[in-house]
Curated annotation (Swiss-Prot):
It comes from Salmonella arizonae (strain ATCC BAA-731 / CDC346-86 / RSK2980). It is found in: Cell inner membrane. It is a multi-pass membrane protein. The gene is kdpA. Signal peptide: none annotated. The system is composed of three essential subunits: KdpA, KdpB and KdpC. This is Potassium-transporting ATPase potassium-binding subunit. Its main location: membrane. Part of the high-affinity ATP-driven potassium transport (or Kdp) system, which catalyzes the hydrolysis of ATP coupled with the electrogenic transport of potassium into the cytoplasm. This subunit binds the periplasmic potassium ions and delivers the ions to the membrane domain of KdpB through an intramembrane tunnel. InterPro entries: KdpA (IPR004623). It comes from the Bacteria.
Length: 559
């Protein structure tokens, strides 16, 4: 089975790199604000129609544009969900959502988290899914990519005060990257058997003679951007383990590739935009190393079997609990790491049913900030924060002012870097503590002991880091949990974006210094090792005590 796992990981990464490199070249053109071939005329018409000027923005104007778009989207989506029963395309006559669930869901999809405290097929109408959630899947993904575009320009421009035009970036990202790639993926999903219709739910008679209602809906179109935009919110409650969302092993592989496609392509784009492809490859190597190790650990943990099943007299040669037989243990383990390394959160197996160590790795990948490939845009700007921290640490060790790509990293940049890195750990630890201290928080726990605490820790980690996956043994649809997680999602998203944009505004005004003999090379194996060590060290120091109370304690309590 080790050979099968190694082959699966290698083939996945090989296909990913083959697809990501050409897409990275297209993204690099957009970073340079150069229209893609053949679309310049279309863009001119769009700018006139939408009233978008070509004036570039400083970091505050760029940030204000992004915040305005997202707050407007949040308000509209909340209204769509709250008054759902009065809107069209609701063949099942589903009622509107409660105010707290509508708020939680709206914040969730606007922040690219896609945490779901509801069952999609029994809660949301087709109109809410299409006009509400799918639209935000595009806009939230475009927002993350636009932020990293601004940060990359800050490194590549000199003595300037502008970072591009946010409205032009958002339109270009959506029309020329997200929409065409999502369309191709959606058509492939339809060919494989994923649903795409507006029919009412279909009553059927099962082989046993029982009556059953099969859910329908425009699934493929939402499924494509759900994966490509690292959104993760499923059309159905079972997410990508549902055969109507993910029917075959082939769609399962394509879904995993779609999750990592843009994050990997952005690494190539960063190297091209910086004028040194080695810089992008160094980040890709660091991400890939952590990813492969994490996949290997989860696969090893899951093929060991579940001792609880063994004591119950069940077959425990491998841990198949919570997994689909059409995917198996290895593919399910790979999917779990892919979806939590990226801030996607889609699942093709129930993470709550993984072994203690198998479930700890996805949780830890979220807790370190979703920087191992990460979300579209957010993964790269998160990793670049760790790059700045790594060069700062290296500067302290050798007694030189830290610099990256020729830009000196001063006190202002380090303050903003520290703030951005500390936002999500504070949310996770304080949010988990609040939940465990209150009756409203503890009453949602369906399991006692270390596993119950793990479910709470996983939920808050998922929300604060904008992942959206869950250990399912938590009744999270209550005013307390909806409000707590909505707060964590909102602050975890924009509490990082704001200091990142401040860093970009500071760096873009600086002049790049030529490299000297004392300059730290940021593209070699030494720096890759330093970067990996920085990520691991920050993650270990921050979360080992909490993990020791949850999955580690659960592992050592196994029979």
């Amino acid at each position: 089975m080790a050979a099968q796992g190694s082959l699966l990981i290698a083939s996945f990464l090989l296909i990913l790199l083959v697809l990501a490199k050409p897409l990275g070249s297209g993204l690099a053109r957009l970073i340079a604000a150069s229209p893609l071939p053949g679309v310049a005329g279309v863009e001119r018409v769009l700018w006139r129609t939408l009233g978008i000027t070509g004036h570039e923005m400083n970091w505050r104007q760029y940030l204000l544009a992004l915040l305005t778009l997202n707050l407007l989207g949040l308000s509209i989506l909340f209204c769509l969900l709250f008054w759902q029963e009065w809107l069209p395309l609701n063949p099942q006559r589903l009622p509107g959502l409660s105010w707290d669930l509508a708020l939680n869901t709206a914040v969730s999809f606007v922040t690219n988290t896609n945490w779901q405290a509801y069952s999609g097929e029994s809660t949301l109408s087709y109109f809410s899914q299409m006009a509400g959630l799918t639209v935000q899947n595009f806009l939230s993904a475009a927002t993350g990519i636009a932020v990293v575009f601004a940060l990359i320009r800050a490194f590549t421009r000199q003595n300037m005060h502008t970072l591009g035009n946010a409205w032009q970036d958002l339109v270009r990202i959506t029309l020329w990257i997200l929409f065409p790639v999502a369309l191709i993926i959606a058509l492939f999903f339809i060919q494989q058997g994923v649903l795409q219709n507006l029919s009412a739910y279909q009553p059927i008679t099962t082989l046993e003679g029982a009556q059953q209602l099969l859910p329908m809906g425009p699934v493929a179109s939402q499924e494509a951007i759900k994966m490509l935009g690292t959104n993760g919110g499923g059309f159905f409650n079972a997410n990508s383990s549902h055969p109507f969302e993910n029917p075959t092993a082939l769609t399962n592989m394509v879904q995993m590739l779609a999750i990592f496609l843009i994050p990997a392509a952005l690494c190539f784009a960063f190297g091209e935009a910086a004028g040194d492809r080695r810089q992008g490859r160094a980040l890709l190597w660091a991400m890939s190393f952590i990813f492969v190790v994490c996949v290997a650990v989860v696969m090893w943990a899951e093929v060991q079997g579940n001792p609880h099943l063994l004591t119950a007299g069940a077959d425990s040669s491998v841990n198949m609990e919570g997994k689909e037989t059409r995917f198996g243990v290895l593919a399910s383990s790979l999917f779990a790491v892919v979806t939590t390394a990226a801030s996607c959160g889609a699942v093709d197996a129930m993470h709550d049913s993984f072994t203690a160590l198998g479930g700890m790795v996805p949780m830890w990948l979220m807790q370190i900030g979703e920087v191992v490939f990460g979300g579209v845009g957010s993964g790269l700007y998160g990793m670049l924060l760790f790059v700045l921290l790594a060069v700062f640490i290296a500067g302290l060790m050798i007694g030189r002012t830290p610099e990256y790509l020729g830009k000196k990293i001063d006190v202002r940049e380090m303050k903003m870097t520290a703030l951005a890195i500390l936002v999500t750990p504070m949310l996770v630890l304080l949010g988990s503590a609040l939940a465990m201290m209150t009756d409203a928080g503890r009453s949602a726990m369906l399991n006692p002991g270390p596993h119950g605490f793990s479910e709470v820790l996983y939920a808050v980690s998922s929300a604060a880091n904008n992942n959206g996956s869950a250990f399912a043994g938590l009744s999270a649809n209550s005013p307390f949990w909806n409000c707590l997680l909505a707060f964590c999602m909102f602050v975890g998203r924009f509490g990082v974006i704001i200091p990142v944009m401040a860093i970009a505004g500071s760096l873009v005004s600086k002049k790049a210094q030529p490299a000297s003999q004392g300059t730290l090379a940021t593209h070699g194996a030494l720096f890759i090792g330093l970067l990996i060590g920085t990520v691991l060290l920050v993650g270990a120091l921050t979360f080992i005590p909490a993990l020791a109370l949850g999955p580690v304690a659960e592992h050592f309590s196994l029979p």
